[in-house]
Amino acid sequence: MGNRELVSMPTFRIPGVVTDTENWRFSIDGLVETPMKLNMQNLTSLPSVRVRDDFTCLEGWTVKGITWKGVRVSELLTLVSVKPTAKYAVFVAPEDYTQGLSIQRCMEPTTILAYELNDTPLRAEHGAPLRLVSRGQECFESVKWVHKMHLTDEHVEGSARNIALDRIASP
């Protein structure tokens, strides 16, 4: 099945997400020397990068040339001093939506936690305050509303793929 080209990102059901980022925190824990909780000001004060990519979904659509801006996950891993036994990061969002990535993939320069989409602040329907983005990823790996990164030595597939496939299969 070919992909339909869309001009903008579609939106789906939005769970009870954070709209007030003043008290919101992103936590990093697990196999790290220095667990951290960062607010949006902390995150946006870190060096930022832009990642431009086509966004393709299993549902059969593509949005060409999307530009994300955010902080590299590798930058955050450096801040917390990852323990040598850590092999995977699990990104956590509301409603038990999780996605695991290898530390190797997290260290890629195009794996970021985005807070802007196409030069505008990320809106809630697109994953604000933070969305996991990695060039070439499957659409379900682009986890919206990320509030935690947990480092572990065990592979964690996460729930993202199954939730996405269930949504596609539902009429």
Where are these regions (language model features)?
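Extended, aromatic/histidine-rich regions of cofactor-dependent oxidoreductases associated
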Residues: M1-F26, V32, L79-P171
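A glycine-rich, hydrophobic loop/mini-helix early in the fold
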Residues: P15-W68
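Short acidic (Asp/Glu) patches
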Residues: N39-Q41, S74-E75, A114-E116
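Mid-length scaffold segments of soluble, non-membrane domains
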Residues: R50-L101
